[in-house]
Amino acid sequence: PGITXTSLHVAPGARLAVKGDIPAGAKSWVINLGKGENDIMLHFNARFDAHGDIRTIV
């Protein structure tokens, strides 16, 4: 479950900015970029409580 954007035209060297609100108590959030669910070129997974440290984003 989440937001899916399609038909993005991203050229080599382009930047992608992501902006949003993270709910209080969230432990992580994920961005997958690729042509499809099984063809991912970039997986970014920010975790806020990795290894018990809540002051570091891993």
Curated annotation (Swiss-Prot):
Signal peptide interval: none
Record SUPFAM superfamilies: Concanavalin A-like lectins/glucanases (SSF49899)
Recorded GO CC terms: extracellular region
Binding site for a beta-D-galactoside: H43, F44, N45, A46, R47, H51
Protein location: Secreted, Extracellular space, Extracellular matrix
Gene Ontology molecular function: carbohydrate binding
Alphabetized InterPro entries for the sequence: ConA-like_dom_sf, Galectin_CRD
Tissue specificity annotation: Detected in most tissues, most abundantly in skin.
Galectin domain boundaries: 2-58
Keywords from the UniProt entry: Extracellular matrix, Lectin, Secreted
Keyword Secreted among UniProt keywords: yes
Keyword Manganese on entry: no
Primary localization: secreted
Any coiled-coil regions, as ranges: none
Function of the protein: May regulate cell apoptosis and cell differentiation. Binds beta-galactoside and a wide array of complex carbohydrates.
Quaternary structure and partners: Monomer.
This protein's name: Galectin-1
Biological classification of the source: Eukaryota, Metazoa, Chordata, Craniata, Vertebrata
